[in-house]
């Protein structure tokens, strides 16, 4: 794939406001940053860039539409043939973009490979603001854990969701003046989209009845790429389908679908694979499910929020560790 490194047609408005570059690359980043992006556009001269890390329509563009963000000004098309090439492309494309548009600051969120755009910003002496900083699961085998450590250390301002995260940052030796506990933006995002979530007709479209199906989402490397975990997880899913005798709707990422097909693993006939859904439809499925089984990082926040407004659902986190210990408190 020919990556894009010429951004001569991209520029800030130069309206006297501070110039802020926001870089995203995956669905969780788009969701969590959606309310923040809207506020930033009011106070800063903003450019929103997408690395292309999730290149499927249902993994990015549908969320820009659902969350009323408009499409990004920049698509980097940075996905390579393998992990090393993708990471290199993200840093290279980010570097080229920053040298051509000269932002006053970079805003990133989380622990994805797209966050490694911070490496380019650091070399160019561009201040880095990192949301969701300080998360740790203490499992060095997870690629996200490496990204977290790198980005936390090189960021100029780390915005943590919790006291747990703040303490982890302090353990890394980061000074207090570079760390702020801001809380998570997810409650604001969900609250502002609640009407659309509740009015979704996705159950009718799929022929499902409230509390008569299980919703499944499994996409992390630890569950999909590790053979032992993969077999264990989907064997358990088949047993779940047999025990409860109800449909299991699997919101299946393209990479996960390919892995299942290549493995030859036979899913129970009650497990229904479906392409990833939009933000409103997926959350409507969550609040109406008999149970939600997921390895998504947003599950603890979503289940907590919906419980607080009488839309509770049993949430089962299929992780060997979590970077959000506050969800277990």
Q: Which residues fall in each region the model found?
A:
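A donor-sugar binding/catalytic signature common to diverse glycosyltransferases
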Residues: 108-109, 115-118, 130-131, 158, ...
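A nucleotide-sugar donor-handling region in carbohydrate enzymes
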Residues: 2-9, 53-58, 77, 154-228
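Glycine-rich phosphate-binding loop signature in dinucleotide/nucleotide-binding domains
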Residues: 15-16, 97-104, 208-209, 288
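N-terminal beta-loop-helix "entrance" segment that forms/cooperates
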Residues: 54-70
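N-terminal subdomain of nucleotide-sugar transferases
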Residues: 2-53
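Active-site and donor-binding regions of nucleotide-sugar-utilizing enzymes
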Residues: 19-24, 29-36, 43, 63, ...
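Structural beta-sheet core signal
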Residues: 22, 48-50, 108, 130, ...
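Donor-nucleotide binding loops and adjacent catalytic segments primarily
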Residues: 53, 61, 197-288
């Amino acid at each position: 794939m020919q990556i894009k490194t010429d951004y001569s047609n991209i520029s800030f408005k130069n309206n006297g406001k501070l110039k802020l570059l926001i870089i995203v690359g995956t669905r969780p980043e788009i969701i969590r940053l959606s309310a923040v992006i809207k506020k930033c556009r009011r106070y800063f001269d903003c450019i929103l860039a997408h690395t292309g890390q999730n290149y499927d329509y249902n993994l990015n563009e549908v969320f820009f539409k659902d969350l009323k963000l408009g499409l990004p000004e920049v698509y980097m098309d940075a996905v390579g043939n393998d992990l090393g090439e993708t990471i290199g492309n993200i840093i290279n494309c980010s570097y080229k973009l920053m040298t051509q548009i000269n932002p006053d600051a970079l805003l990133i969120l989380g622990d994805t490979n797209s966050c490694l755009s911070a490496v380019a910003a650091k070399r160019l002496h561009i201040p880095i603001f990192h949301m969701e900083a300080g998360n740790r699961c203490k499992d060095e085998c997870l690629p996200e854990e490496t990204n977290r450590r790198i980005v936390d250390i090189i960021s100029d301002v780390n915005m943590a969701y919790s006291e747990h995260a703040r303490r982890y940052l302090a353990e890394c030796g980061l000074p207090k003046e570079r760390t702020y506990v801001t809380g998570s933006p997810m409650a604001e995002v969900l609250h502002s989209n609640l009407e659309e979530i509740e009015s979704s007709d996705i159950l009718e479209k799929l022929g499902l009845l409230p509390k008569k199906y299980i919703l499944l989402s499994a996409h992390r490397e630890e569950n999909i790429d590790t053979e032992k975990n993969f077999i264990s997880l989907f064997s358990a899913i088949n047993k779940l389908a047999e025990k409860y005798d109800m449909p299991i709707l699997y919101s299946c990422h393209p990479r996960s679908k390919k892995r299942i097909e290549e493995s030859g693993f036979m899913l129970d006939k009650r497990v229904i694979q479906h392409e990833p859904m939009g933000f409103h439809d997926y959350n409507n499925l969550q609040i109406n499910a008999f149970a939600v089984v997921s390895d998504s990082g947003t599950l603890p926040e979503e289940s907590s929020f919906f419980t607080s407004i009488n839309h509770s659902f049993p949430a089962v986190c299929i992780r060997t560790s979590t970077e959000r210990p506050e969800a277990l408190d």
